[in-house]
């Protein structure tokens, strides 16, 4: 029977939900092909022929355009067709496949509290849905899930789309010469319930919290004189369908997330279109040596934790333990004691059970309590809601090269010397503590401020970061982050190989830069000072995830020259196109308020690669971009960062950030439970090469999750599909350095080290990290923490191979450091 006859005979299929959809023979063929693959008989031609036989049987049994078959009818006939054709083994595999699919559907419906699954819920992996259900989907007062993943993505996309609507030419005038009555708009805040789902754009309805964001965004722009019409007139345009074109923008944002091409940071997905409305992940607060300020910071931190954000605080302004307190004639308790207060607040405010509270506690190397601070977390149970880092400035590096190595510790109260220590011994202490407990990290404030174009406007250097260290922020600044899934931008060639789609990458960067800029406008900040500081700089943090999976797809080793070159190009493109799009936004919407007071008008940019890489190695026209900035300004003070993306990568079903894969088989433990993962790309390759078996998987699990040294695995696979523990720590640093050259802010990455590294190795890593231009670093020696997020599936996992620096790193060190 040819296709035209099929189309005339069977037109539709009835799904389990009762919905009717178009019949598609290819779906039958694909299901049979998967059963063939399960029996190592992956034959597309045979699958197509068997699918044809299934259709013929459907017709024979009387199914027509008026008698529509159900999914179950078709699957029953597939089983009988496979048996009748003498393929009993394939039939068995199909029956197992069918049973597993039924079981998976039931599990998904149970997790989501649904009776049927829509296309988005079907598309997403079960573990992804578990994470969405546990943290992101709205619940009622009985803690029952009351929205589907589709509805979640719709509420996020709708809110972000509101950020575009008020910049429509019918409404917005950048000049700022349009006085409007903002009290009229504010009056609607008192009657939000009356406007719940009253307005929509296309098929996207505004709930009352969307409507609140529309009001607040209008008031913000009207206060600048940029609204040409009153708020009632805006509502008239909405009601009259004069703004329907923005449904396409909302759909674009929705599609980006549903396709797992891009995801914003967790608070955006948790809170967009909800009562809290707080969308940012990263915050920094100040802490001055005055009790009222300390208590305000504590209160502000609690509000941030409640809304799903994390806080970084530099405690170096607090006087050292034992110093005189003039007002009481007593002595100071020191900064660590106040960190304990914040730690307790974090413990009490559980962020609604959705996210564990997170802090970055920083003390700079010159502080008299630095030694106590360094060793504070070497025992379990101390400051468990904190990452801690030592802040390093130029003077510390200078002391390391001095003959005596003397380094002066000074009182924060009057900057007078308190004592001298040996800088080498201090670095040894940091290295020893990190070797024991993975704490503290190091933050290189000299590198952070080297190209800080914003310092001129703020009249101060940057002195703090968010909890994961990838965002350097001024006090009360926040930043909303988002990550592009790079592995989704790979396209398959006719010969079965893959290549990266650079055009789609550029398009995605531009769309997501606009997405994150909109988030600033529709955000409901937890503290007024944060609102002001965040909008003064309009800082965003666009990053990536899926780097390891991308390299696997392209068959490029992570720690190879080719791998580093590709990562450099990816990094440069990310920042170039995001900054170029930010300039375009400045041209249409206006530059960030403090732009004219920065070094941007002088032609400076916060990108080290522009200054430190030879111009002939630049891929893009940076000089032309600088001229555009001088002409039009730029919308966002910085646009790029690379976040760890732990939970986001689980939802996107890809590898974390720019990290290599931790292991090819591992267990992940998070707040909501224990999930098991196997790298799908490696699984496919093993199957393609007839190597996939329980025995091989057990060997990989028992080999520290690595392919290295397994006799049955070809050498090219061992070299290509490397894990974090296959890669020498110097290559981890090299990869971070390659990305850092082109990233405006910083990078959150773990420098993985095997159990048997020495304290001297850790110290050497610090020195190499600074030499490579990193803005900070964190080492993790395997087994050095009593609680470990990532675990090997096998309890018998052991490493049976040596790890050495790549030839690329050796050559770099030879050419740039030892000579």
PLM region spans:
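Extended catalytic cores of very large enzyme megasubunits
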Residues: 1-819
């Amino acid at each position: 029977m040819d296709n035209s006859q099929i189309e005339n005979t069977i037109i539709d299929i009835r799904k389990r939900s009762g919905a009717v959809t178009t019949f598609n023979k290819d779906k039958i063929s694909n299901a049979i092909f998967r059963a063939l693959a399960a029996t190592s008989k992956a034959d597309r031609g045979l699958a197509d022929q068997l699918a044809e036989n299934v259709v013929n049987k459907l017709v024979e049994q009387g199914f027509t355009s008026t008698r529509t078959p159900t999914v179950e009818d078709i699957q029953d006939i597939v089983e009988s067709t496979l048996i009748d054709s003498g393929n009993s083994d394939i039939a068995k595999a199909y029956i197992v496949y069918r049973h597993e699919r039924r079981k998976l559907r039931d599990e998904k419906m149970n997790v989501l509290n649904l009776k049927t699954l829509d296309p988005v819920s079907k598309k997403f992996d079960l573990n992804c849905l578990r994470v969405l259900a546990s943290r992101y989907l709205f619940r009622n007062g009985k803690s029952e899930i009351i929205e589907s993943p589709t509805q979640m993505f719709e509420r996020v996309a709708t809110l972000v789309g509101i950020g575009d609507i008020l910049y429509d030419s019918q409404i917005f005038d950048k000049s700022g010469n349009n006085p409007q009555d903002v009290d009229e708009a504010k009056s609607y805040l008192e009657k939000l319930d009356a406007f719940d789902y009253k307005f929509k754009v296309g098929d996207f309805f505004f709930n009352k919290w969307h409507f609140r964001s529309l009001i607040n965004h209008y008031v913000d722009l009207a206060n600048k004189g940029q609204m040409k019409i009153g708020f009632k007139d805006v509502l008239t345009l909405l009601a009259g369908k004069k703004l329907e074109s923005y449904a396409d923008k909302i759909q674009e944002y929705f599609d980006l997330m549903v396709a797992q091409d891009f995801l914003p940071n967790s608070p955006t997905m948790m809170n967009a279109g909800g009562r809290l409305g707080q969308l940012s992940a990263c915050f920094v607060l100040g802490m001055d040596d005055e009790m009222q300020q300390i208590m305000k910071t504590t209160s502000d931190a609690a509000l941030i934790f409640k809304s799903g954000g994390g806080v970084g605080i530099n405690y170096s302004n607090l006087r050292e333990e034992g110093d005189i307190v003039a007002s009481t004639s007593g002595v100071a308790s020191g900064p660590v004691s106040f960190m304990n207060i914040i730690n307790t607040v974090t413990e009490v405010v559980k962020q609604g059970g959705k996210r564990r509270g997170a802090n970055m506690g920083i003390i700079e190397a010159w502080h008299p309590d630095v030694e106590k601070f360094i060793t504070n977390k070497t025992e379990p149970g101390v400051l468990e809601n904190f990452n801690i880092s030592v802040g390093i400035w130029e003077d510390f590096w200078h002391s390391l090269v001095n003959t005596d190595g003397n380094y002066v510790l000074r009182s924060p109260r009057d900057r007078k010397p308190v004592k001298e220590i040996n800088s080498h011994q201090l670095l040894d202490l940091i290295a020893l503590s990190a070797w024991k407990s993975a704490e503290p990290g190091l933050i290189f404030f000299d590198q952070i401020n080297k190209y800080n174009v914003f310092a001129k406007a703020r009249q101060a250097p940057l002195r703090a970061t968010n909890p994961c260290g990838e965002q350097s922020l001024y006090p009360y600044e926040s930043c909303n982050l988002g990550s592009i899934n790079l592995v989704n931008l790979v396209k398959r060639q006719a010969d079965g190989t893959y290549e990266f789609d650079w055009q789609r990458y550029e398009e995605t960067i531009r769309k997501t830069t606009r997405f994150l800029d909109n988030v600033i406008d529709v955000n409901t900040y937890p503290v007024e000072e944060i609102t002001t500081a965040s909008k003064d700089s309009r800082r965003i943090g666009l990053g990536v995830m899926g780097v390891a999976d991308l390299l696997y797809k392209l068959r490029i080793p992570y720690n190879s020259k080719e791998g580093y070159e590709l990562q450099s190009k990816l990094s440069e493109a990310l920042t170039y196109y995001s900054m170029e799009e930010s300039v375009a936004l400045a041209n249409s919407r206006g530059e960030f308020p403090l732009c004219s007071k920065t070094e941007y008008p002088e032609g400076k940019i916060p990108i080290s690669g522009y200054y430190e890489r030879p111009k002939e190695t630049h891929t893009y026209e940076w000089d032309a971009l600088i001229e555009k900035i001088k002409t039009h300004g730029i919308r966002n003070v910085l646009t790029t960062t690379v976040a760890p993306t732990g939970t986001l990568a689980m939802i996107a079903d890809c590898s974390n950030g720019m990290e290599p894969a931790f292991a090819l088989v591992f267990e992940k433990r998070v707040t909501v439970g224990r999930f098991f993962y196997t790298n799908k790309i490696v699984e496919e390759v093993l199957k393609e090469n007839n190597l996939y078996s329980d025995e091989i998987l057990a060997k990989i699990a028992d080999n520290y999750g690595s392919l290295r040294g397994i006799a049955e695995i070809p050498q090219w696979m061992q070299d290509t599909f490397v894990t974090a523990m296959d890669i020498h720590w110097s290559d981890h640093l090299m990869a971070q350095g390659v990305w850092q050259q082109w990233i405006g802010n910083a990078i959150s990455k773990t420098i993985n080290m095997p159990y048997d590294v020495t304290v001297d190795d850790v110290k050497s890593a610090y020195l190499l990290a600074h030499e490579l231009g990193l803005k900070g670093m964190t080492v993790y020696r395997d087994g050095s923490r009593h609680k470990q997020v990532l675990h090997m599936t096998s309890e018998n996992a052991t490493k049976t191979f040596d790890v050495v620096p790549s030839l690329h790193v050796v050559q770099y060190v030879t050419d740039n450091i030892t000579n």
